[in-house]
């Protein structure tokens, strides 16, 4: 039960659980039965190095290494992580933080899609799955959306609820909500 060394991917074990293996065939995530792997989207129970590397590459340009980690949030048992895979490679990630505000229980953070995989609907698929989860919980979602991501969030039904503002070292954002 392994993959070729150097390839990240998924296999099923004898109990029908999905295992995500890293490049050395070490099991890094045990997921519920395969029904949780859908359209290349996988709920993760924690962030791993690939997740942090993608966050850093896409979201933390010019900032020091380590800024891609969200202390206290990444370790919070209530935090959910949704990742997108294509060909066994992590190409998109998001963090769904429990951070209640005005009718929204959840906040999207760390939403990133690999530059080589943009404009393929991966970000929208991630957001729609997060919305499905929030809807099942009877709540909405809020986020601080980068200017370049606002059109995607609007297509997914989010609305701007603030004027544009700057997060130092990161760039211009809008506060957005989906209820």
What are these regions (language model features)?
Residues 113, 119-132:
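Conserved acetyl-CoA-binding loop-helix of GNAT-fold acetyltransferases
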